[in-house]
Amino acid sequence: MLFRSNTLTEVLCAAGIREYAVSETQKYGHVTYFWNGNRSGKVDETLEVYEEIPSDVIPFEQAPAMKSKEITEKMVENMASGKFRFLRCNYPNGDMVGHTGVMEAVVYAMECVDSGLKAILEAADKYGYTVLITADHGNADQMTETKKGKTSVRTAHSLNPVPFIIYDKDNEWIIKEGAYGLANVAPTIVKMMGLTAPECWEASMV
């Protein structure tokens, strides 16, 4: 498969920015291969560090925390190191546990993600980072559906809009009114970092 050019990683590497990416096996490809436009390997070996945390081979509803604790620890550790200007992670819990349809497990899974995000935000305050929080689709947000008057468990992805949250204790960022999608995330990131976006990109949200 041909990879797509003008990815965010290419722009960051061209600017000499060091990056860190982490997730567990279930979503590792989403912060590496898919993130880089279907590119196997790194754009620049000297600037990028990828870390995969092996997922447990167990039904997700039996271990809904998944590897959220380990992902959080790796993020905080690398934020504290000061080695990276741009870091990214993916928590698979809402999607993978959401597919099981087991409500109690889904609630606990999202509590684990909440706990992880709390630690990352605290680290951002301590080490001077801005945090962006978003998703590529929903699942855990809609666990039931009603058809012909009958309510049943829903295990598929939802079609609800996803959030885009900017957390920055030192700066105020205003998201402009508009209809946005994932294609607007990279332009927003480079603008916030003071970089120039490729002309082929969509508009920044700020």
Predicted ranges, named:
Residues 1-206:
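Feature captures the catalytic ectodomains and active-site-proximal regions of enzymes
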